Amino acid sequence: MKSERFSLDANILFYAVDRASGQKHAIATRIAARSLDADCILTLQALTEFFAAITRKKKMSASEAAHLVRNWMSIYPVVPPTEGTLNAALQLVTTGRASIWDATLIACLQANDCHYLLSEDMRTGSRLGEVEIVNPFMGSLPRALEHLLSDDE
């Protein structure tokens, strides 16, 4: 079964490289590895948030983190915000549905036909526009994303 397009939030990227994160590291590593053969996109925002978090918490040097971000940019399609996504984000914010940062992330995903955001920072199961938030650390994934955690290779 072909999965629908999804994206990884900065925290999933963080846990994928932070070996001290225990079970979250194991889950995020599996998701990251399996996302390579799936319809996964990354946002410019998630990459910059990852860089800021991983270097602020001194888990990597700026040079190491930059190398990793550049590597991901060569592997995954990376979607930047645009004037149109900012307008869509402002609509979400003014209706009280999200912060400007979450709204910008969601608007970028929505503009790129992305149906799921894997993140632990937003309420799992909630839907902002066409994007469903999924926390992979809270149990099961939607059917379209089950292959990311299944035992099947």
Residue ranges and their predicted role:
Residues 1-42, 57-64, 140-146, 150-153:
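Short, well-structured N-terminal submotif of metal-dependent ribonuclease cores
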Residues 10, 102-103:
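Conserved glycosyltransferase catalytic-site signature
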Residues 49-77:
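Active-site-proximal, substrate-binding regions of enzyme catalytic domains
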Residues 45, 49, 67, 88, ...:
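Amphipathic alpha-helical interaction segments
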Residues 103-145:
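Acidic, metal-binding active-site segment of PIN/NYN-like and related structure-specific nucleases
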Residues 44-48, 74-95:
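Acidic catalytic patch
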